[in-house]
Curated annotation (Swiss-Prot):
<protein>
    <recommendedName>
        <fullName>Very long chain fatty acid elongase 2</fullName>
        <ecNumber>2.3.1.199</ecNumber>
    </recommendedName>
</protein>
<dbReference type="InterPro" id="IPR002076">
    <property type="entry name" value="ELO_fam"/>
</dbReference>
<keyword id="KW-0444">Lipid biosynthesis</keyword>
<dbReference type="GO" id="GO:0034625">
    <property type="term" value="P:fatty acid elongation, monounsaturated fatty acid"/>
</dbReference>
<dbReference type="GO" id="GO:0006636">
    <property type="term" value="P:unsaturated fatty acid biosynthetic process"/>
</dbReference>
<feature type="transmembrane region" description="Helical">
    <location>
        <begin position="67"/>
        <end position="87"/>
    </location>
</feature>
<dbReference type="GO" id="GO:0019367">
    <property type="term" value="P:fatty acid elongation, saturated fatty acid"/>
</dbReference>
<keyword id="KW-0276">Fatty acid metabolism</keyword>
<dbReference type="GO" id="GO:0009922">
    <property type="term" value="F:fatty acid elongase activity"/>
</dbReference>
<dbReference type="GO" id="GO:0042761">
    <property type="term" value="P:very long-chain fatty acid biosynthetic process"/>
</dbReference>
<feature type="transmembrane region" description="Helical">
    <location>
        <begin position="115"/>
        <end position="135"/>
    </location>
</feature>
<comment type="similarity">
    <text>Belongs to the ELO family. ELOVL2 subfamily.</text>
</comment>
<keyword id="KW-0256">Endoplasmic reticulum</keyword>
<dbReference type="GO" id="GO:0042759">
    <property type="term" value="P:long-chain fatty acid biosynthetic process"/>
</dbReference>
<dbReference type="GO" id="GO:0043651">
    <property type="term" value="P:linoleic acid metabolic process"/>
</dbReference>
<keyword id="KW-0812">Transmembrane</keyword>
<keyword id="KW-0275">Fatty acid biosynthesis</keyword>
């Protein structure tokens, strides 16, 4: 335990030296004072993917229909709460859409910070997206984009909550909460085969995510053009990170919806097929069929 505490002290000292004093308003909040819980949960997440795939290799895929229904409903409701609370609290604080500092809104800033803590915590809950893929043997959906997005968001938002827990930080989570209401409603409906014929709007979810990232970059850079005291380095980092998501999601969109099929066998997956988190098993099944024909 002494070695663990020493490791914790070293990490926290390093982060404090890098980013400066933490925001005192969030001291003592669950999982924020030490980086270790966030770090170890992320390591466990990555190990679970690797070990889980090995464990499931020679075992049948699990259905998990009931669990997935409850899970998607829970994330949808949490996202709805965060969206409503962020709109109400920023309205109460008179937040400036172009640039909002960290202190001028008083109690409204604390209210925003509390919602953003739930946003941070929800990123650890969303690790279950990938775990469910593993248990259902949906390995084609566990892409670099998927894992990068899930792992990085959880760690980045630990930093956000400690140093910039309100102000300009509100915008991205507000948009993301709205997008997640749509996404997890879609995922929940996709569990039921009878609903598949109504799920023709998958690609529009990806388009909405891309719009979300572009709007977040625009909002972030507006505070660079007209500064209000929000940390400049944080603005540049957030814009750069969002740009990586734009590139990765745009690549996925082009590969999935715009690229011409190589063969007639490889067709656009119909809306009736099961879709989860922007990936369709039917597409990869068709691709494998083409390769198998070539090998014969």
């Amino acid at each position: 335990m002494e070695h663990l505490k020493a490791f914790d002290d070293e990490i926290n000292a390093f982060l404090d030296n890098m980013f400066g004093p933490r925001d005192s308003r969030v001291r003592g909040w669950f999982m924020l004072d030490s980086y270790l819980p966030t770090f170890f949960l992320t390591v466990m997440y990555l190990l679970s993917i690797w070990l889980g795939n090995k464990y499931m290799k020679n075992r049948p895929a699990l259905s998990l229909r009931g669990i997935l229904t409850l899970y998607n409903l829970g994330i949808t409701l949490l996202s709805a709460y965060m969206l409503a609370e962020l709109i109400l609290s920023t309205w109460e604080g008179g937040y400036n859409l172009q640039c909002q500092d960290l202190t001028s809104a008083g109690e409204a800033d604390i209210r925003v910070a509390k919602v953003l803590w739930w946003y941070y915590f929800s990123k650890s809950v969303e690790f279950l997206d990938t775990i469910f893929f593993v248990l259902r043997k949906k390995t084609s959906q566990i892409t670099f984009l998927h894992v990068y997005h899930h792992a990085s968001m959880f760690n980045i938002w630990w930093c956000v909550l400690n140093w910039i827990p309100c102000g300009q930080s509100f915008f991205g989570p507000t948009l993301n909460s709205f997008i997640h209401i749509l996404m997890y409603s879609y995922y929940g409906l996709s569990v039921f085969p009878s609903m598949h014929k109504y799920l023709w709007w998958k690609k529009y979810l990806t388009q909405a995510q891309l719009v979300q990232f572009v709007l977040t970059i625009t909002h972030t850079m507006s505070a660079v053009v007209k500064p209000c005291g929000f940390p400049f380095g944080c603005l540049i980092f957030q814009s750069s990170y969002m740009l990586t998501l734009v590139i990765l999601f745009l690549n996925f969109y082009v590969q999935t919806y715009r690229k011409k099929p190589m063969k007639k066998d490889m067709q656009e997956p119909p809306a009736g097929k099961e879709v989860k988190n922007g990936f369709s098993k039917a597409y990869f099944t068709a691709a494998n069929g083409v390769m198998n024909k070539k090998a014969q």
